[in-house]
UniProtKB/Swiss-Prot annotation:
<comment type="similarity">
    <text>Belongs to the gentisate 1,2-dioxygenase family.</text>
</comment>
<keyword id="KW-0058">Aromatic hydrocarbons catabolism</keyword>
<dbReference type="InterPro" id="IPR013096">
    <property type="entry name" value="Cupin_2"/>
</dbReference>
<dbReference type="GO" id="GO:0051213">
    <property type="term" value="F:dioxygenase activity"/>
</dbReference>
<keyword id="KW-0408">Iron</keyword>
<dbReference type="GO" id="GO:0009056">
    <property type="term" value="P:catabolic process"/>
</dbReference>
<keyword id="KW-0560">Oxidoreductase</keyword>
<comment type="function">
    <text>Involved in the biodegradation of 3-aminobenzoate. Catalyzes the cleavage of the 5-aminosalicylate (5ASA) aromatic ring to form 4-amino-6-oxohepta-2,4-dienedioate (cis-ACOHDA). Can also convert gentisate, but the catalytic efficiency with 5ASA is 70-fold higher.</text>
</comment>
<dbReference type="InterPro" id="IPR014710">
    <property type="entry name" value="RmlC-like_jellyroll"/>
</dbReference>
<dbReference type="InterPro" id="IPR047183">
    <property type="entry name" value="GDO-like"/>
</dbReference>
<dbReference type="Pfam" id="PF07883">
    <property type="entry name" value="Cupin_2"/>
</dbReference>
<keyword id="KW-0223">Dioxygenase</keyword>
<dbReference type="InterPro" id="IPR011051">
    <property type="entry name" value="RmlC_Cupin_sf"/>
</dbReference>
<protein>
    <recommendedName>
        <fullName>5-aminosalicylate 1,2-dioxygenase</fullName>
        <ecNumber>1.13.11.86</ecNumber>
    </recommendedName>
</protein>
């Protein structure tokens, strides 16, 4: 009759001895590390341009190169990821301000980065990557692949603000972060459009192969917008989940923008309502123009020009556009998930392709209000 008690006593003793040996019983904790579906660990969030810009401009007066600030940027920190200073678990975005006449010194790091010109009046404002100058017209995308030397300069009379996106949360998780300061003459200068000329369809005979493992590229917004508009004009239906959407591809292999980050631009046509879906990738959005709503797990996030919002991995989401065309830029960690063989995507099917809206994000109070309290 004492057998069950003896079993439990012996099992408890085994567990205690295992703990002292720094071992863990899989039969007891398997559900903690082998989940039936992704455990997200952070919430959707939205940062309004009109709230962030005044803070950035105040920083422009206080944080200066003369006071030792190498970069003047403000991170979009998810409330659930404060210790990592990140926007999603793998992506960190920020707004960076470079005032008229300022420069930011050269450095390089293990994290890959992109720059998206959120507000620019053009002219001689640029990032120099591996010695090549990449100009920044408004809404242009510039790449800073992992380990590349880069510096910034604004030789105009106007401030510029761009969106930074880096994979440093992932790099830090892998304990692979490296940072190295440099000088403006660290890399031999290259002519403007060096990469586009070397990677184009036509190249002078006798030119050497492209020297970089990942392209140092500038993707002009005028070209991307023309591609989106042409697709819409042709009558293309686009994606049921994202409308007309285009990826910024790697010209060396037609793959993702960078090994860890894929950048995209999408056009939502007037009154367009996309179907809900979810994926094991997380995505950060920047609103180029237009107004609309993205519903994430039943909560409505209303957005306008300059706003930034994050959709966590495995979160149901869909877009509801307003009365005019809306253009969105986004960064996703989908390449990481595909490389690891763990990318999954699922369409929302019950009871239909759209979620029931149960709440709305209140950016003023920084909270979600349930419909019953609205």
């Amino acid at each position: 009759m004492n057998a069950p008690d003896s079993f439990q006593t012996d099992l408890d003793a085994l567990h205690e001895d295992m703990a002292r040996a720094n071992m863990a019983p899989t039969w007891k904790y398997v559900s903690d590390f082998v989940a039936k579906e992704p455990r997200v660990g952070f919430r959707p969030w939205l940062w309004r341009w009109n709230d962030v810009l005044p803070l950035l401009m105040r920083a422009g007066d206080l944080i200066t190169p003369e006071r030792g600030a190498e970069r003047r940027s403000m991170e979009h920190v998810n409330p659930d990821l404060k210790s990592a200073y990140s926007t999603s678990h793998t992506i960190a975005t920020a707004f960076q301000l470079v005032r008229a006449g300022e420069t930011a010194p050269a450095h390089r790091h293990a994290a890959a980065a992109i720059r998206f010109a959120a507000r620019s009046k053009g002219g001689s404002v640029y990032t120099r990557v591996q010695g090549e100058r990449l100009m920044m017209e408004e809404f242009d995308l510039l790449l800073t692949p992992a380990g590349t030397w880069h510096e910034h300069a604004n030789e105009t009379a106007n401030d510029i603000v761009w969106l930074d996106a880096l994979d440093f949360p992932l790099v830090n998780l892998l304990k692979a972060s490296v940072f190295e300061p440099g000088d403006s003459d660290t890399c031999e200068p290259k002519p403007d459009d060096f990469s586009r000329q070397h990677l184009g369809l036509y190249r002078p005979v006798g030119w050497s192969d492209y020297p970089e493992p990942h392209p140092v590229m500038r993707y002009p917004w005028v070209e991307m917008k023309a591609a989106l508009d042409a697709a819409a004009s042709s009558g293309a239906t686009g994606s049921p989940f994202d409308g007309i959407v285009m990826a910024y591809t790697n010209p060396l292999n037609s793959g993702p923008t960078l090994p860890t980050l894929s950048c995209r631009a999408q056009l939502l046509r007037p009154k367009e309502s996309t179907c809900a879906h979810r994926a094991t990738s997380s995505t950060v959005y920047f609103v180029i123009s237009g107004t609309g709503t993205t519903v994430v797990n039943g909560t409505a996030y209303r957005w306008g020009p300059g706003d930034v919002f994050v959709v966590p991995n495995w979160a149901w989401h869909e877009h509801l556009n307003g009365d005019s065309d809306a253009y969105l830029f986004s960064i996703t960690d989908e390449p990481v998930m595909r490389t690891l063989g763990i990318y999954r995507e699922q369409a929302y099917a019950a009871p239909g392709p759209h979620q029931l809206i149960t709440g709305e994000f209140d950016s003023t109070q920084q909270c979600v209000r349930e419909l019953s309290s609205l």
